[in-house]
């Protein structure tokens, strides 16, 4: 399974690799409640809630056999790259976080409607209702995750098991090949 401590390690690695603030590791709290199997009404999936098209742009395969949007590690690296590219465009973390929620097209439209303003709080009224609450929710999640001890909140170690599926194999395969393809050690 994926423990919260383990998930924090790969999130930190991906964010560090792209020079991103470590606070972004809390974005999946808002996106999916840290559930790698979460699916939204709109069809977004996984820890980072990628739509199929966006996932494909960032190298996440999604077909009848596999949905890499639900792979916490691959999706985290894809999300880090996406967040970096949006920061290169907007240069403002509030806008980046809002764009992660509603898409850059919606942010660009809000900026146009706000006469070119690029301050999140000045385009706030031009954003979808869900996105208006998204940035404050992210700020709140960061506060709670940083200052939980000051409020007598005790963290609990969670261990959400990885989702599994059955795949039919039509050819002979050695366990070494399967282990190699799945990138897991072969137990002796």
What residue ranges belong to the model's regions?
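Short, functionally critical alpha-helical segments immediately adjacent to catalytic or ligand/cofactor-binding
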Residues: 20-37, 96-103, 142
